[in-house]
Design a protein with these regions (language model features):
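Beta-strand-rich cores of mature extracytoplasmic or soluble domains
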Residues: 62, 66, 71-74
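Short recognition patches in nucleic-acid-associated and regulatory proteins
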Residues: 14-59, 73-79, 86-99
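Short cysteine-rich clusters marking metal-coordination/redox-active sites
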Residues: 9-12, 65-68, 90-93, 108-111
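Short Cys/His-rich micro-motifs in 6-15 aa windows
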Residues: 71-73, 111-121
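Residues immediately within or flanking Cys/His clusters that coordinate Zn2+
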Residues: 4-6, 58-62, 84-87, 105
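His-enriched metal-coordination microenvironments in redox/metal-binding proteins
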Residues: 1-6, 123-125
Length: 125
């Protein structure tokens, strides 16, 4: 089950909600592929070709889009056998994003003055 996190800037009071983690529907590679654009889907399929049961880790991770100036959730997959990690672009503008660790500090993408606070506000599946 995934979690819903709220990111808040103590300086400018901007806030963002992000659905992080993964749901029960993300257990099979076929359903996870749908979360990525076609070019990344092809890379994932090429990297897992020949594997009967591909081993992978999938999660929606927090990321900062400096173009949109906000926090977004992006799909990230790690393929164990290939040792490859693939991350989708910003879901709003398509730009490359900077994936963040949830326990790390995230500078406010709106004002750039303070680190965001993070609070879990719900669950999703």
């Amino acid at each position: 089950m995934g979690r819903i996190s709220e990111f808040v800037c103590p300086s400018c009071n901007m806030s963002w909600e992000a659905r992080l983690g993964h749901g029960m529907g993300h257990a099979a590679l076929g359903s996870v592929l749908e979360e990525f654009p076609p070019d990344i889907q092809q890379k994932i399929l090429a990297d897992t070709e020949g594997e009967q049961y591909p081993a992978f880790e999938f999660n929606y991770c927090p990321a900062v889009c400096w173009q949109c100036q906000k926090v977004v959730a992006v799909p990230v997959i790690y393929l164990h056998q290939a040792g490859q990690t693939y991350t989708a672009a910003c879901p709003d503008c398509g730009n490359s994003i900077a994936v963040q660790t949830e326990d790390g500090e995230i500078l406010c993408p709106h004002c750039g003055k303070e680190n965001l606070t993070v609070e879990e506000i719900g669950r999703w599946d």
